[in-house]
Design a protein with these regions (language model features):
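Long intrinsically disordered, low-complexity regions that are acidic and Ser/Thr-rich
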Residues: 112-150
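A structural motif corresponding to the C-terminal end of an alpha-helix
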Residues: 154, 158-163
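Generic short N-terminal amphipathic or hydrophobic helices
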Residues: 21, 29, 102, 119-122, ...
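Short, T/G/N/S-enriched strand-turn elements that build extracellular solenoid repeat scaffolds
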Residues: 1-4, 16-23, 36-42, 55-63, ...
Length: 199
């Protein structure tokens, strides 16, 4: 397992084959020729993937981050590629885009009350994926001023785009906030949710 506690993880390799865990409590970067994932890739911040060839996420493989910025030569997904944050995800495939798994934003609402309290958003905290956080609210007093908080990270506008054919037999949920563009052809026997669809 490759881990980064309070530090970004950066992985540069010709061929990346992951059946274990790659995890970061900050941002993570993967630069590769080919990426074959049947394990778990987690980032509490932004996960940036620059893969020149084929990216295979298979056998219930999981790629999850607060924000996804992924560029690949082609994509074959039968697992889960999930963004837990509210920013628009960015996924670009220069070649064919095959999806029979799940791609997109988390099914768990990010704001307001959770209508299904049994479902708790999972944000990675360690390589084993365990951890917890507790927030308690109290009224500030003059003797106990509120400390300023760090500003939230901002990210670029997102998109899902392929210059090849997009074949979706699974689920692509862009949260209705971003555009999906398939410049060659689109075959959809699954579910698509986007602000705009361009073929």
């Amino acid at each position: 397992a490759a881990t980064g506690e309070n530090h970004a993880v950066s992985l540069h390799a010709r061929n990346v084959h992951n059946s274990g865990t790659i995890a970061s409590q900050d941002d993570a970067n993967i630069h590769s020729q080919t990426l074959d994932n049947s394990g778990t890739v987690l980032s509490s911040g932004q996960l940036t993937v620059r893969n020149l060839g084929r990216l295979k996420n298979q056998n219930n493989g999981t790629i999850q981050a607060a924000r996804l910025d992924m560029s690949t030569g082609s994509l074959d997904n039968t697992g889960n590629i999930t963004q837990t944050g509210s920013q628009a995800l960015d996924l670009v495939s220069a070649g064919k885009f095959d999806n029979s798994g799940k791609i997109g934003v988390s099914d768990v609402p990010q704001t307001g009350l959770n209508p299904n309290p049994s479902v708790i958003p999972q944000i990675p905290s360690t390589a084993t994926g365990s951890g917890s956080s507790t927030v308690s609210a109290s009224k500030p007093s003059s003797n106990n001023p509120v400390s300023p908080t760090a500003p939230a990270k901002t990210y670029a506008r997102g998109r899902i785009q392929t210059t090849g054919a997009l074949d979706n037999a699974g689920s692509i949920n862009a949260g209705g906030q971003i555009d999906i563009a398939a410049k060659n052809s689109l075959e959809n026997s699954g579910s698509l949710n986007a602000a705009k669809l361009q073929v």
